[in-house]
Amino acid sequence: MAANDKEKWGIAHIFASFNNTIITVTDLSGAETVTKSSGGMVVKQDRNESSPYAAMQMAANVAAIAREKGIVGVHVKVRAPGQGKQRSPGPGAQAAIRALARAGMRIGRIEDVTPVPHDSCRPKGGRRGRRV
């Protein structure tokens, strides 16, 4: 088996908050960006940037460009805002993973890389928390 017959894999970094979704495909080292897309690149309204529809469109665009550059499969790293903010990914995360698979990309590992504090900064909201 020659060296050029080897399949090329990448990493799909999906940042999904409740305001936006950003998908970046890098090489396996994570140093070189192959392609990226965000909610504002595919929809007009700000409120739709985090929607599953926008995530599906972004994933399809990203998958097409990545396949042109020779990437056949991706390992997925899902990230939410984390730290003192929301620790669960937004609505676009699952739709993006599903759309990547539908676009013909092979999915390797799916990993949650949300930053979780080990008792560092005091969360905002004061002593009694946020009162609604």
UniProtKB/Swiss-Prot annotation:
One of its GO terms (molecular function) is structural constituent of ribosome. Keywords: Ribonucleoprotein, Ribosomal protein, RNA-binding, rRNA-binding. The keyword Ribosomal protein applies. InterPro entries: Ribosomal_uS11, Ribosomal_uS11_archaeal, Ribosomal_uS11_CS, Ribosomal_uS11_sf. Part of the 30S ribosomal subunit. Located on the platform of the 30S subunit. This is Small ribosomal subunit protein uS11. The lineage of its organism: Archaea, Methanobacteriati, Methanobacteriota, Stenosarchaea group, Methanomicrobia. The gene is rps11.
